[in-house]
């Protein structure tokens, strides 16, 4: 014997089921809201990866463990138009200096492991050129060594100079290219723009390739001070960080 259910009955039955399910869901207690800096920076980690470890595609860089002063300066640069990325500007525009510093200090405090460097396809000759520029600079082009400001171990110098290791080659290439083309700026005197202007495209590729392939040291924490400059080193004065001591003033 077949039971027959009218369309009206079916509709009422479906509504009763829906109401019952809704009541069941609403009866489940909501998780308590945690107003923490980790929760408030979810908009950051959505792109920059959990805990600011960096996105897997290499487009969004690591935030975790970078010097607080550097992160703060970059947040200001995005908010105030010295760096250009629409989404970042929109997120930061309504935020105060004090809140940006709180964000910077939070990410700076995170000590999470770096991924292993990606093997490079760059030629040995290109890598040698990159190593020389990073470690020694090029006096003929008046280019200082990268380690002069970014630290002997290239892990950065507190409070305002970032590390250069653990970053993808494409990201490094893009940022150096942005300095060279004038798309990226810092507080005057804009030392990075002046340095990169003296590098050709091959130099930029060499530096990015060598840094991206270089293994990280055991300690990735920023150095407390920049290394002493050797005699004849090219002096650098940066608006976003305290001026480095010139070689002539060293003993």
Residue ranges, per PLM feature:
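N-terminal secretory signal peptides that target proteins for export/translocation
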Residues: 1-9
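Bacterial N-terminal signal peptides
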Residues: 10-24
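Sec/Tat signal peptide C-region and signal peptidase I cleavage site
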Residues: 24-30
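Flexible coil segments in periplasmic/lumen-exposed cytochrome c-class electron-transfer proteins
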Residues: 30-41, 50, 86-93, 97-155, ...
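The feature marks the first
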Residues: 32-81, 85
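His/Cys-centered metal/cofactor-coordination and adjacent catalytic loops
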Residues: 53, 112, 164
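Short, recurring structural edge motifs at helix starts
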Residues: 57-61, 89-92, 159-161, 194
């Amino acid at each position: 014997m077949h039971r027959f259910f009218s369309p009206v009955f079916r509709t009422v039955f479906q509504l009763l089921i829906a109401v019952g399910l809704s009541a069941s869901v609403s009866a489940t207690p909501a998780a308590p809201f945690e107003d923490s800096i980790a929760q408030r920076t979810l908009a950051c980690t959505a792109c920059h990866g959990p805990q600011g470890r960096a996105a897997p595609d290499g487009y969004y860089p690591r935030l975790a463990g970078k010097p607080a002063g550097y992160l703060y300066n970059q947040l200001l640069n995005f908010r105030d138009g010295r760096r250009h990325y629409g989404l970042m500007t929109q997120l930061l525009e309504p935020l105060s200096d004090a809140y940006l510093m709180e964000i910077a200090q939070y990410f700076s405090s995170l000590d999470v492991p770096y991924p292993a460097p990606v093997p490079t396809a760059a030629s040995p000759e290109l890598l040698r050129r990159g190593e020389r520029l990073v470690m020694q600079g090029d006096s003929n082009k008046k280019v200082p060594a990268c380690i002069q400001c970014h630290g002997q171990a290239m892990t950065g110098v507190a409070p305002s100079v970032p590390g250069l290791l653990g970053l993808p080659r494409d990201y490094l290439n893009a940022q150096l290219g942005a300095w060279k083309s004038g798309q990226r700026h810092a507080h005057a005197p804009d030392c990075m723009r002046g340095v990169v202007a003296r590098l050709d495209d091959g130099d930029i590729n060499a530096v990015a390739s060598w840094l991206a392939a270089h293994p990280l040291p055991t300690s990735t924490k920023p150095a407390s001070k920049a290394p002493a400059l050797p005699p004849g080193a090219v002096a650098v004065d940066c608006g976003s960080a305290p001026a480095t001591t010139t070689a002539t003033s060293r003993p």
